[in-house]
Regions:
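P-loop NTPase switch/coupling surface
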Residues: 1-194, 362
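Short active-site oxyanion
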Residues: 162-163, 283-284, 348-350
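Minor-groove-contacting beta-hairpin "wing" of winged helix-turn-helix DNA-binding domains
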Residues: 194-199, 317
Length: 363
């Protein structure tokens, strides 16, 4: 949905402002205090309101791409809500939203907003993009695996555990990723009636009923599994992010330093899985990271990737884009295909040496 981002500054002081073509994956790198987290915040604010913020420090404007006619009805259906009992619905209108947040909008105007999103960006964002944008940052990633309400199974799901509990395909996809990462099987435990909890089991459930049921066999199965709240912060952070991505199915995903709490190999795994999930042509992933392993995972996924290096020195901001075509050339060169080369993107200066012995001396 996001087509391009125009910044307020360019490659160097005095040059034309840089414009970033939004690929499925856009990675923001650079030293500390260069604006990586700030640009994610400004993207999120735009997706929620659709209006330009005069207080923006980095982003001048954001362009949106129209929704294709063949998937238009599917996109509308994805955010359409049923009227509550006694709630008045005007002719030709629908309720759109997510969870408790809802708007009554003209169906014709909604379709037009998705077909020509740049004509009325406020409508496009407030009616659609606001409900399809997810940000994962340091404030919420550990808490994503905490207990959630089971809700009324007769009503639409509006929390991630509720979605996974009802959708066998999504639940099994999350389980596959977690098993490949940690060697244990993620299951959803409904035996605390009215609540849903995540557990890690040494054995997979024999069938869906053993996982989703409350009969004696299901209770015993979950009792033998470890509550995920007893796992390490790295396991909880990784599981929470994967769960939210697959259950929420966002069109725009914003991740701020996803490598926090993770071993380098897990950072690589997360980058690869996230990029695979978000590689659909109409989805966009924006990441601010300090991890060359995460960046390498994104590249290894095969999804188109842009790397944007941000800097801020002596009150001068710069942005340099490493486009996907150049990244492919870099990765096809055996001498340059390493996380050591990518790690140079995160520093102010890089020293190139002849051998490992020289490198060790400078380190």
């Amino acid at each position: 949905m996001i087509k391009d981002i125009k910044l307020k500054f360019g490659r160097a002081e005095g040059l034309a402002p840089e414009s970033i073509e939004a690929m499925p994956i856009t990675v923001f790198v650079g030293p500390n205090n260069s604006g990586k987290s700030k640009i994610l915040t400004e993207i999120q604010q735009f997706c929620a309101s659709g209006s330009r913020n005069a207080n923006n420090l980095l982003i001048e404007s954001i362009g949106l791409s129209p929704v294709a006619e063949e998937i238009l009805d599917k996109k509308i259906q994805g955010v359409t809500l049923k009227p509550n009992p006694g709630e008045a619905l005007h002719p030709g209108h629908i309720f759109v939203g997510k969870g408790p947040t809802r708007h009554q909008v003209s169906q014709t105007a909604f379709k037009q907003a998705l077909k020509t999103p740049n004509a009325q960006q406020t409508h496009t964002c407030q009616w659609y993009l606001a409900y399809n944008t997810l940000i994962l940052n340091g404030n919420n990633r550990i808490n994503l695996v905490n207990q959630q309400a089971a809700g009324n199974l007769q009503n639409p799901a509006h929390m991630s555990f509720q979605v996974l509990f009802r959708d066998d395909a999504k639940r099994k996809e999350v389980r596959r990723i977690i098993h490949e990462a940690f060697g244990q099987h993620l299951v959803i435990d409904p035996t605390n009636l009215g609540q849903l909890n995540l557990r890690l089991s040494k054995e997979p459930p024999q069938d869906d009923m053993q996982e989703r049921g409350i009969h004696a066999e299901a209770v015993e199965f979950h009792a033998n599994a470890m509550p995920i709240t007893q796992a390490s912060d790295g396991v909880k952070a990784f599981t929470g992010m994967v769960t939210e991505m697959i259950a929420g199915d966002p069109s725009v995903l914003l991740m701020d330093e996803p490598e926090a709490f993770l071993h380098p190999s897990l950072s690589f795994k997360l980058g690869k899985e996230v990029s695979g999930i978000m590689s659909a042509s109409d989805k966009r992933l924006f990441v601010a990271t300090h991890s060359p392993n995460f960046v390498m995972g994104c590249i290894q996924s095969g999804a188109p990737v842009n790397i944007v290096r941000l800097t801020y020195r002596n009150e001068v901001a710069t942005a340099r884009v490493l486009p996907n075509e150049d990244i492919l050339k870099l990765m096809r060169n055996p001498l340059l295909r390493s996380t050591g080369v990518l790690s140079g993107l995160f520093y102010e200066f890089v020293i190139v040496t002849e051998s490992d012995a020289d490198r060790a001396f400078y380190q």
